[in-house]
Amino acid sequence: MTLKEFIIPAIDIKGGKVVRLYKGEFDKVKVYNENPIDMAKYFEDAGAEHIHVVDLDGALEGLPKNIKILESIVRSVNIPIEFGGGLRSFEAVKAVLDLGVERVVIGSLAYQNPEEFYKIVESFPNKVIVGIDAKDGKVAIKGWTEKTEVSPLEFAKKYDDLDIFGFLFTDVSRDGSMIGANVEATVELAKNLKHPVIASGGVGSLEDVIKLYEKREFGIFGVVVGKAIYEGKIDLKEI
């Protein structure tokens, strides 16, 4: 896997626009682009192998809210899209996969309704990424607004034997901060799981990406990068 393949550029959508939150706080929003579809095309042209799309409105409301935009993104590019945000029912997941999304990220539902989650994984093998959002070493749900008492590893172990694609581990306290990814926690998680782990949160430079890339033998599949690209700290075309 090349370094470029390891990077999964992110498009976070709120109110129909491309935004980034700071540390998962919905009142700390910065708009980077008015058009998510243009952004997706840019990433494809820059050589991205896949794109990570998040419906922030959906994450907050518990139901995908930017479906039309998602559909347009899927139609506009020829690279796989992974999507998360508000996928809290079988119907919502099916609708998104029917649009042509490659993989779905599910977090809150896996925690709150394991039965429904098992049904989804059974129906869509290898299509589900379990989203693990961590705040102060514990899993956070409902768009990061609610903290549980469960550790990321404890949470992940419940699903590691299922036919999932892997896990997405986000350190919410670093998300949008560009202070560097939590390499240690990501490696610790990946080492103890059978399925691959995608890292997310805090990447501020190509050096941060390389630190994770060098640990890929432990089961790290890639890293989601958002703000560092939008702020010009990482240029996909140059990699």
Curated annotation (Swiss-Prot):
Cell compartments where the protein resides: Cytoplasm
Matching Gene3D superfamilies, A to Z? Answer: Aldolase class I (3.20.20.70)
GO terms under cellular component: cytoplasm
Q: Which reaction does it catalyse?
A: 1-(5-phospho-beta-D-ribosyl)-5-[(5-phospho-beta-D-ribosylamino)methylideneamino]imidazole-4-carboxamide = 5-[(5-phospho-1-deoxy-D-ribulos-1-ylimino)methylamino]-1-(5-phospho-beta-D-ribosyl)imidazole-4-carboxamide
Q: What Gene Ontology molecular function terms does this protein carry?
A: 1-(5-phosphoribosyl)-5-[(5-phosphoribosylamino)methylideneamino]imidazole-4-carboxamide isomerase activity
Q: Catalytic site residues?
A: D12, D133
Q: Which PANTHER family would you find in this protein's record?
A: 1-(5-PHOSPHORIBOSYL)-5-[(5-PHOSPHORIBOSYLAMINO)METHYLIDENEAMINO] IMIDAZOLE-4-CARBOXAMIDE ISOMERASE
- In its UniProt entry, what is this protein called? 1-(5-phosphoribosyl)-5-[(5-phosphoribosylamino)methylideneamino] imidazole-4-carboxamide isomerase
